[in-house]
Amino acid sequence: MKVNLDRNSSGFCIGVQGTIHVAEEKLRAEIGLYSLGDVVHNEVEVKRLESLGLVTIDDQAFRELRDAPVLIRAHGEPPSTYETARANNLEVTDTTCPVVAKLQRTARQLHLLGYQVIIYGKPVHPEVIGINGHAANSAVIIKHADLSDPAETAPLDLSRKTALISQTTMDVPGFYQLKENLETLFRNAGNPQEGPWTEVRDIDITLGLTGMQPTAPHVYKDTICRQVSSRNSKLHDFALSNDCIIFVAGKKSSNGQVLYNICRDANPRSYFIEDTGDLDEGWLKEANGSPVGSVGICGATSTPMWLLEKVARHIESLER
């Protein structure tokens, strides 16, 4: 049985790499450090960092904390978090992913331009909560690109000028499907002659804020991280090239669920685990009991490479 470890499209994305590196540097310096929420959506990695001294706290504990160092993770935070930190004299180490920080700025500027902001994303995801905060908590959040949930579309004002953006880890096809469905929804509610929504650039937003250029009534900006989305096709091909796939990710990982489904669609013999203890040796065998020819080990943007290597070594040891 050949064990293939995917090093090209698995493991931490750049944003998470930065957060983990900063956390480790702080902890190595023996500086006490609190993390507002799980530093990454991978329980195994969180436990490793907690063993080094990281303390994970929730929103309530954060509001009660005083005079202490706090890490802002890659997902980012709403403005209210920073206001609380200043009021409580907290030393903030901000590791918000640069892609997310840019998206937060876009959401804030679109809101200032008077747009009704729509976020394609998951309402309870910390990144979306942060983005919405930068739009004064007024954004309409839509998870289902087919507009199948009436509760998601109920807050929409179809007479307002509107801007569509996205959580950075959502799927690209879904974003453009949502755009088309929103175009139809708004067209049917108002002007039947209205054309496609306008793609808005950073320069367009800047010119709009300065009053140098009028803004289109309905705009969209594809804010999905291409480093994340480019993994989709690569993992699809990786899953096809192996007899069996062991996908390693945390159960809380939104990106992990998306990538696992891609693997499973390409190869039905794809299995989701958090750590080696979840592995069923029967997955690695053919119907006649012989080992599969190859097993691929891959994971999410929140899965550390050391954990993928651990799983690969464990599987290799089963043949000895």
From Swiss-Prot:
Record's keyword annotation contains 4Fe-4S: yes
GO biological process assignments: dimethylallyl diphosphate biosynthetic process; isopentenyl diphosphate biosynthetic process, methylerythritol 4-phosphate pathway; terpenoid biosynthetic process
Residues engaged in binding dimethylallyl diphosphate: H41, H75, H125, S253, S254, N255, S302
Domain of life according to the entry: Bacteria
Transmembrane segments annotated in the record for this chain: none
Residues annotated as signal peptide: none
Broadest EC class assigned to this enzyme: oxidoreductase
Entry cofactors: [4Fe-4S] cluster
Keyword field contains Glycoprotein: no
Pathway: Isoprenoid biosynthesis; dimethylallyl diphosphate biosynthesis; dimethylallyl diphosphate from (2E)-4-hydroxy-3-methylbutenyl diphosphate: step 1/1; Isoprenoid biosynthesis; isopentenyl diphosphate biosynthesis via DXP pathway; isopentenyl diphosphate from 1-deoxy-D-xylulose 5-phosphate: step 6/6
Cofactor note as given: Binds 1 [4Fe-4S] cluster per subunit.
Pfam families named among the record's database cross-references: LYTB
Entry's family note: Belongs to the IspH family.
Protein name in UniProt: 4-hydroxy-3-methylbut-2-enyl diphosphate reductase
Species in which this protein is naturally found: Chlorobium luteolum (strain DSM 273 / BCRC 81028 / 2530)
Gene: ispH
